[in-house]
C-alpha cells in the first residue's frame, strides 16, 4: 500500500488522500508522459486502475496530444488535495484536468475543461478504467450511477455527471455514462463552441451515498446578463442534507454571480453550511 501523499513534478506523480485511516480513499495520478494513468483505492479495494486519457474530436477530427501533461497547480491544505494538469492538443486546443479530493466532505471531483481557439463541434469521451472487481450500476431514469461490487450488493461510490441534466429524458441522445470494455465513459458534446466542461462528482462517503441525490446546472451572471456556457459554468450538488457548489471560468475572467455568491476566481469548489452560506473548499484565482 502506498503511504506517501503529495505531488512530485520530477516524478510526474501525485497521490491525493483525505486522511491516513486504512479505509480512506487514495488516488494516484501519473502524468509524466503524454497519457495519464490513474489508480483509485479505498483500503484494500481497488476501484479503478489504468489509462485515464480523454478522447476528443473537433469538427469530427480526432485530436492528438502534442505535449506531455504539465502540472499547472497543486494545493494540499486542511480542506482538500487539488491537482490541475494541462495538455496541448492538435488543432490548437488544450485540455485542463481538475482533480480534487476533499477531506471532511469525502468526495472526489474530476473534470476536464476543453479549450479551443475557434468555435467548433466538440465531442468528448472521458474514460475511467474500472477494475474487474467493480461494476457501474446505472440508474434507470437519471444519469447517475454507482460503483459497486460485481453482484451489486456493496456500493463503493456515487457518480454524478454534472454537465448533463439529471433526467435522461432531458438530455441529448448518446450522451451520459456508459461502460465499454470495462471502462466507464462519460460522453458529452457541444455545438459551435469554444469550450466544453465535463465534470464528475464522485461521492465516497459510504453512509451518505444511500441518500437521495440531485444536481443541476446554475445560471452564471455578469452585469445582470447571463454568461454563456463557453465562458463559465456552475453547478449545485446535493446528497442527503449536504450541498456543494462548483464553478469554472472558461474564457475571460469577470466579476460574476452564482446563486448570489460573488466571485472573480477561475475555479471554486465550495460547501453550503447550515446557514446556507458558501464556504470555499478550494478556490483558485
Summary of predicted features, one role per range:
Residues 190-204:
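Short Pro-Gly-centered flexible turn/kink motifs
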Residues 1-153, 227, 268-284:
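Catalytic and substrate-binding regions of extracellular carbohydrate-active enzymes
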Residues 21-26, 44-49, 90-96, 120-122, ...:
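Short, surface-exposed beta-strand/loop "edge" segments at domain boundaries and coil↔beta transitions
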Residues 53, 63, 73-74, 129-131, ...:
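Polar low-complexity intrinsically disordered regions enriched in Ser/Thr and small residues
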Residues 205-285:
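Non-catalytic terminal regions with compositionally biased, polar/charged low complexity
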Residues 113, 125-127, 137-194:
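Beta-strand/loop-rich accessory regions of lumenal/periplasmic or secreted enzymes
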Residues 66-71, 108, 183, 210-218:
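Tryptophan-centered motif/residue detector
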Residues 132-137, 166, 212-215:
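Short glycine-aromatic motifs
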